[in-house]
Amino acid sequence: MIVDKLLDDSRGGEGLLDAAGDCGLMTSPLNLAYFYGASPPSAPGAGDTGYLSAVPSAPGSPGSDSSDFSSTSSVSSCGAVESRPRGGARAERPQVEPHMGVGRQQRGPFQGVRVKNSVKELLLHIRSNKQKASGQPVDEFKTQSVNIEQLTDLKSAVSAVGKRKGPDPLSDGPVCKRPALLPSHFVTSPQTPTPGESMEDVRHSESKLDSSAALLQNIINIKNECNPVSLNTVQVSWMSPTVPQNSPRDQCQDFHGGQAFSPPQKYQPFQVSGSPQMMDQASMYQYSPQTQNMQQPPPLPPQQQHQQNYPHNSPLQFSPYSRMSQSPKYDSNLFDTHEPQFCTGQSFVSLLTGPGEPESLAVPVPAPTSIPPQTETQLQTFSLMPSNACEAVVGVHDVGSHSLGTSLSLQNIMGSPMNTTQLGKSFFQWQVEQEESKLANIPQDQFLARDGDGDTFLHIAVAQGRRALSYVLARKMNALHMLDIKEHNGQSAFQVAVAANQHLIVQDLVNLGAQVNTTDCWGRTPLHVCAEKGHSQVLQAIQKGAVRSNQFVDLEATNYDGLTPLHCAVVAHNAVVHELQRNRQSHSPEVQDLLLRNKSLVDTIKCLIQMGAAVEAKDRKSGRTALHLAAEEANLELIRLFLELPSCLSFVNAKAYNGNTALHVAASLQYRVTQLDAVRLLMRKGADPSTRNLENEQPVHLVPDGPVGEQIRRILKGKSIQQRAPPY
C-alpha cells in the first residue's frame, strides 16, 4: 500500500529508481536508527516525508524483499531525479540527508548489526558487468532486488562442477593454454554421456563451464580471506621447496582444487639436542596422503648405508603408492617403538670403526667359555639404543669419544679378574668350599676319632647345627663307609640331627645314604624321635630323602615298649592335653609353650597318617590302637581326627587284649572335663555300647558314680535321645 502511494504522489517510477540509486541503500548497510524506526519525525515542509516517517518500516532479514521495499519507499521522498552510478552513493549521501530533513540525530539503543553479504555483492557485480558488456541497459532496481534468478548462476556452477564430463578447468585462461597443476590421479577421466543426454547439452554445459569455474574460484578466494585454519590442522605447501618451521602463518597455503594434508602426530619430527640425524628426522620420511601407511623397507648393506646421504630440510614429496605398497625411501623412526632393542655385536663394533675400516675391535677380548648365561644378559645392557639407531649414527664422526668410553668400560669389565666358578652359586656352596679348604690337610683317621661319649666330629657338628661342616664330614665319612657310626647311646649322626630338629642336615644325610630305619638303645627309630618331639619338618625331610635315595621307611616299627611312631605321638599329645587341663592360666608363658607343642604334635600326627601310618595298628604289650590311647585322656581333638577318616568303622570297635573298646575306656574315666563329649562323639561315630570285654562288662558298667556318670549312662542307654511323638 505504501508503494502505491509513493508511485501516485511522487514524480514517477524512474524517480524512485533514481532515488534508490542515489542513496545506495541496497549496496551498503542501512542506517540502524532509521531502519528500526528510531529516527525523529521529518521536519515540516518536507512533503510526504512526514507520512513516511509516521509509518514504521518492519525490520527484515538482510536479503528480504520487505526491507528492500521499505528502504526504497523511505528514500523515495529524497527528491533526487537524476540517476547516479552505484559507486557514488556514499559520496552523495551527505547532500541527500539535508533534503530529507533528518540530519545527524542521537540514535536509540543498539539493537543489532546488519552484516553486508559479500557473496551477494559479488553476484550483483558480476551480473551488472555482463549486462554492460552485452549492451543491455542496466536496471538498478532489478539488480538490487532479491529474486530466485540471482542464484541460478551459482546453482549452475555447482551443478556443473558436480557433474562435469571432462577435466575441470580451475583457472581463468583458455582450456588449451592452462598449465597442469594437479597430478594425473587427481584428474577425473572423461566420461561418455548417458543415452538420455544429448551432445548439445554437453556442449552447452561446456560453454558455461569457463564462466562458472571463474565464479566458483572467486567465491573460494573470498571464503579463504579469513584463513580458516584450525588448531589441529597443518597445511603443507606441496609446491614450495622449503617450509619454514617457525612460521605458522606461512603454513597456511592455498592448494588449488586439492586438500591440505599433514603427517600424523606419531611421525612428527622429534626435537632433541644431539646429532644432526636426530635433529632432521623430518627429512627421513615421505608421506603419502592416499595411503597414510608407513612401513620399514628391508635393511641396506653396510656399504650403502655409509654412502647414503640424508639431505637436510628436504621438502615433503608426494608419492602415490597404493594402500598395500610402501615407499622405498622410507626410513623408520628412531623413536617409533617403545621397547628398546639391543644392538647386535656387528652394529656395536661399527661405532668404533670408520666407514672404510674393518669392523673389529682394537683390543681383542676373548670370551670365556665358562661364563654362565647370566653374564651375557648383564653385558647386553650396555647398549639400550634400538638397532636402527645404532646403524643411523654410523656415519657420524663426532661420536668417537663416546665410543672410546664405551669400549674402555667394556674392556675393563670383560678383562677384570673374576672367579667365574663362583658365579651362580649359593651361600651354602660357598661355605662347603671354605670348609673343604680347611679340612684338606686332615688325615682320614682323624675323622673317625671319638670322645668320651663316643661322639665323632660329625656328631658334634650335627648337634651344633653346622650344616656346611656336617656335609663335608659326612661326605668324607661316607667315602669310608662309616656314615652310620653310633655313639654310646646307639644314636647315629642322622638320629642326632633328627633329635636336634635340623631338617636341612637330615635331608643332606639322607641324600648321602644315611639309614632311616636305624634304632638307638631304646629301640627308637628316627620316626619315633620325630613323633615324640613333634618335628613335622624333619618327617617331611625324611620322606623326601627316602624317595630320592630309594629307601623304605618303616612306619610300623615299634620301640622296646611296643609302640609305633603314631602311638608315641598320641601319648605325647595326651601329656600336653593333660597339662593344659590342669593349668588354668591361659596367658602364662608355660601355657603358650604348651599350645605351640600341641600344634606341632597334631601336625606330626597328620604327617604320619599322610605318610601311611595305620591308626588300627596295636601296640605289642596291650594291643591298644591309637584310638584307645586318645580315649584314655578323652582327647577330643585326636578322637575327632581319627573318626573322620574313611576307615574309621574298621577300628572304632576294635578291642584291646583285655577286650575293651575305645568306648569302654572313655566311659570308665574319672575327673575328666571332656569325658561326656568324648562318649557322645564315639556314640555318634558308630561305637557299640553293647560290646562286652573279657570280664563280660559293657561300657555302662564301667561308668563311675556321680552327676556326670548319670549323664553318661543315659547316653549309653539311648535315653538322652528324645522319644518320637506318636503319629496320632
From Swiss-Prot:
Tissue-specificity statement? Expressed in kidney, liver, lung and heart. Expressed at very low levels in skeletal muscle, spleen and brain.
Segments of this protein annotated with the region Required for transcriptional activity? 329-403
Q: Where is this motif: Nuclear localization signal?
A: 163-178
The task this protein performs is described as: Involved in regulation of NF-kappa-B transcription factor complexes. Inhibits NF-kappa-B activity without affecting its nuclear translocation upon stimulation. Inhibits DNA-binding of RELA and NFKB1/p50, and of the NF-kappa-B p65-p50 heterodimer and the NF-kappa-B p50-p50 homodimer. Also seems to activate NF-kappa-B-mediated transcription. In vitro, upon association with NFKB1/p50 has transcriptional activation activity and, together with NFKB1/p50 and RELA, is recruited to LCN2 promoters. Promotes transcription of LCN2 and DEFB4.
* Main localization category: nucleus
Q: What is this protein called?
A: NF-kappa-B inhibitor zeta
Q: Where in the cell is it found?
A: Nucleus
UniProt-listed SMART domains: ANK (SM00248)
Question: Which residues, by range, are in coiled-coil regions?
Answer: none
The organism's taxonomic lineage, starting at the top: Eukaryota, Metazoa, Chordata, Craniata, Vertebrata
Q: Subunit arrangement?
A: Interacts with NFKB1/p50. Interacts with RELA. Interacts with AKIRIN2.
Keyword Transcription annotated: yes
| Stored PANTHER family | ANKYRIN REPEAT FAMILY A, NF-KAPPA-B INHIBITOR ZETA
Extent of Basic and acidic residues compositional bias: 83-96
Could you tell me which residue ranges the OCA domain spans?
A: 107-129
Q: Which GO terms describe its cellular component?
A: cytoplasmic ribonucleoprotein granule; nuclear speck; nucleus
The UniProt annotation puts the region (Interaction with NFKB1/p50) at 414-728
Give the observed phenotype of the deletion mutant.
Mice have splenocytes with defective proliferation in response to LPS but not to anti-CD40, IL-4 and anti-IgM. Though mice grew normally after birth, some of them started to develop atopic dermatitis-like skin lesions with acanthosis and lichenoid changes at the age of 4-5 weeks. All mice developed the disease by the age of 10 weeks. 5-week-old mice show pathological changes in the conjunctiva, including a heavy lymphocyte infiltration into the submucosa and loss of goblet cells in the conjunctival epithelium.
In residue numbers, the region (Disordered) covers 45-107, 241-334
